[in-house]
Amino acid sequence: MVREKVKVSTRTLQWKCVESRADSKRLYYGRFILSPLMKGQADTIGIAMRRVLLGEIEGTCITRAKSEKIPHEYSTIVGIQESVHEILMNLKDIVLRSNLYGTCDALICVKGPGYVTAQDILLPPSVEIVDNTQHIASLTEPIDLSIGLQIERSRGYNIKTPNTFQDGNCYPIDAVFMPVRNANHSIQSYGNGNEKQEILFLEIWTNGSLTPKEALHEASRSLIDLFIPFLQAEDENLPLENNQYKVTLPFFTFHDRLAKLTKKKKEIALKSIFIDQSEMSPRIYNCLKKSNIHTLFDLLNTRQEDLMKIEHFRIEDVKQIMSILEKK
């Protein structure tokens, strides 16, 4: 088990794994923190992340079993201790890991007597078993057991219905494609008054097909993919093709206008006005904050060349900043 002391950054937004352990092959646990966050942000991120962790991450399951010797789901087979229904439930619990797209076939072909476990499943190279010891059936007599399996990668869950019984010898299996067993978030506040900030604690339990850290990365990518269209909407709605006629703000204009603004304002006043008191968009605010620009004085003493080196910062943001500063 890995466990670390929680150290909170006072400036740059950071995430960290503070605890990680494997309770068994099919139960992993991870605890993460994200800080510092402004009041209200931790709950927003925590709720969104939990929903994505539990509903959007893909998993791999056995979704169908087929055997010529099985008359119906609730029958028993001579020489097998478990009923057909129990065998199907055991197959449902098998935890798989894969980079599969769509479906594939697998096979169980065993001669008794003996125990049939997950390691007896013949799989394609793209699929692997997390726990080879998972029990499937007990053969009490020297019989041949042959079961064809269908394996699928998807998300959420798939509950069988009467309509899914298409073949008399083919039995659909309830599939739960969610590799994250549970996810919780909690919030700790610190600071006073307007300086109050939050720490987000995120706990993740997985079934072993991926680690909590991998689950967190996948959930983050899923959320990013959801929001990217909003970032592109402004460009796509412009009437000009490829936006080839966008006007950029010359560097010398930026410097000249900043110099005039600085002369008009007292240095003490500028140092006491924080950027979060201005009408900047959250994206611009976060970009500036990550670059240790906290007050208007810091901003007015930053060259445009340096601003444009900030990750995700654009020339349109410079125009917006100039417009805001001229109102001060």
From Swiss-Prot:
The keyword Transcription applies. The keyword Transferase applies. SMART domains: RPOLD (SM00662). Residues 268-328 are annotated as: Alpha C-terminal domain (alpha-CTD). Signal peptide: none annotated. It is an enzyme of class 2 (transferase). Its EC number is 2.7.7.6. The N-terminal domain is essential for RNAP assembly and basal transcription, whereas the C-terminal domain is involved in interaction with transcriptional regulators and with upstream promoter elements. NCBIfam families: rpoA (TIGR02027). This is DNA-directed RNA polymerase subunit alpha. It comes from Citrus sinensis (Sweet orange).
